[in-house]
């Protein structure tokens, strides 16, 4: 018989970035430690995860179906739309290193002038690799996804209008973890491991 408690709903979520090699939390309830930056509010669409595989099929003479398959590679993507405009999101969206940005402080004047951030972008900007953490939250239920090394593989269009926030749609692609570890680690609360 089904159990409604096993239905997981992503009521809210958080996403964090840090330099590659930053220590991940050791449990789903542990706080994100030093070095992790909260990327702020996300669109109500939540997070979209996609998994893909590229397989080789071995055919045998006289057989209609493949007799064996082998996975050549697996990949995943995590798409999130962020609502806040922060230096970290500008870096990820425009592929700009923090060291290539300049923050000019506000001037009280006269004349007064606001603080502003300046940077340039080029067509061949280097990718920005980062460690990525995602929490999907429903009350005390948490699914925590920890990606040791991720790159932004796709960016949605930015719309500026009076009807909506000027958001940042980013698709993150996990890359091979440093030192050969797991590319993606997960903690999921309240899921029982069934033994045969």
What are these regions (language model features)?
Residues 1-196:
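Signature of extracytoplasmic/envelope-associated structural regions
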């Amino acid at each position: 018989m089904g159990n409604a408690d096993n239905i997981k709903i992503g009521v809210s979520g958080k996403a964090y970035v840090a330099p590659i090699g930053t220590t991940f939390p050791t449990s789903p309830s542990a706080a994100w430690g030093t070095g992790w930056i909260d990327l702020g509010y996300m669109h109500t669409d939540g997070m979209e995860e996609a998994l893909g595989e590229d397989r080789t099929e071995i055919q045998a003479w006289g057989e209609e179906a493949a007799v064996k398959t082998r996975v050549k590679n697996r990949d995943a993507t995590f798409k999130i739309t962020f609502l806040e405009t922060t230096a970290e999101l500008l870096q990820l969206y425009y592929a700009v290193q923090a060291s290539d940005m300049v923050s000019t402080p506000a001037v009280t004047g006269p004349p007064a002038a606001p603080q502003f951030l300046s940077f340039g972008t080029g067509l061949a900007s280097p990718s920005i690799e980062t460690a990525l953490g995602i929490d999907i939250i429903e009350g005390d239920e948490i699914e925590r996804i920890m990606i040791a090394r991720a790159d932004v593989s796709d960016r949605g269009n930015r719309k500026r209008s009076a009807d909506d926030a000027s958001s940042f749609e980013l698709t993150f692609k996990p890359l091979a973890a440093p030192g050969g570890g797991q590319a993606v680690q997960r903690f999921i609360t309240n899921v029982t491991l069934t033994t045969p």
